[in-house]
């Protein structure tokens, strides 16, 4: 099985420059990689989900969004391939506490792999971003604890592994490591470090790609890591490969590069 995760940059720049070619670039990468699951962050209803090529529209020939009734406000959507997995249960919730436009949230699903009958839970999430006070750091830990509560509920009901994908706004940055650290304390494993084949690359750039002549080009190389894929009940899966997709196309699509995780259910 395969997951594609990316913060696709909500972008509140001048109207007409919001998305341009970026959704198309993201679609091309997804259709080339062919993941079972696509997790997004900053999927802004007013930019990424609107205009001539809304992300949900250009993916719909191959992918279905869970809880589409929340599409008008869900910045962290989760899409799946119905030909390979089916939904057993799913949900969406914005985090309590500090939030902006309810963009810090989680979309989740429990899925059955059709070829094996085995279950896996997948979550797309985005933690609080500010770094102005100790309360901001505490908010990211609260975000992690909300995910922990969900993980324990799903484990009790379905007994399957959970894979959490997203921008935790945590790392060797001004935000600090709190959100990521809390996830590890809860019992999540960073798949970067448990995969048979792995990539130690950065995931995010502090500069945005350039808008020029109607499209985005020349994205910078990443220089920090705040995006992660983490597994709960990791012993129930075989982590085969983790990598950061760093190409001219991926760098032009967002300030965050896609994370790809290949795994098998045990």
Show where each model-derived region lies.
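Short, Asp-centered acidic motifs that coordinate Mg2+ and/or phosphate
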Residues: 1, 36-37, 120, 161-163, ...
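Metal-dependent phosphoester-hydrolase catalytic domains
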Residues: 152-163, 170-266
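Structured beta-strand-rich core segments of catalytic domains in phosphoester-bond hydrolases
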Residues: 19, 37-129, 241-243
């Amino acid at each position: 099985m395969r997951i594609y995760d990316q913060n696709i940059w909500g972008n509140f720049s001048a109207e007409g420059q919001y998305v341009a070619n970026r959704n198309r670039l993201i679609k091309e990468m997804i259709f080339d990689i062919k993941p079972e699951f696509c997790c997004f962050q900053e999927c802004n209803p007013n930019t990424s989900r609107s205009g001539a090529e809304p992300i949900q529209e250009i993916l719909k020939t191959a992918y279905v969004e869970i809880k589409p009734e929340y599409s008008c406000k869900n910045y962290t959507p989760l899409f799946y391939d119905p030909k390979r997995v089916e939904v057993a249960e799913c949900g969406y919730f914005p985090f309590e506490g500090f939030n902006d436009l309810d963009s810090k949230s989680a979309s989740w699903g429990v899925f059955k792999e059709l070829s094996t009958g085995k279950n896996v839970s997948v979550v797309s999430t985005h933690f609080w971003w500010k770094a102005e006070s100790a309360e901001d750091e505490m908010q990211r830990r609260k975000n992690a604890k909300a995910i922990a509560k969900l993980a324990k509920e799903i484990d009790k009901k379905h007994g399957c592994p959970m894979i959490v994908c997203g921008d935790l706004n945590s790392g060797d940055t001004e935000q600090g490591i709190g959100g990521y650290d809390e996830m590890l304390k809860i019992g999540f494993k960073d798949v970067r470090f448990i995969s048979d084949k792995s990539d130690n690359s950065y995931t995010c750039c502090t500069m945005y790609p350039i808008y020029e002549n109607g499209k985005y080009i020349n994205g910078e190389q990443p220089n920090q890591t705040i995006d992660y894929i983490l597994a709960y009940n990791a012993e129930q899966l075989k982590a085969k490969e983790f990598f950061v997709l760093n190409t001219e196309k991926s760098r032009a699509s967002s300030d965050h590069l896609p994370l790809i995780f290949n795994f098998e259910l045990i």
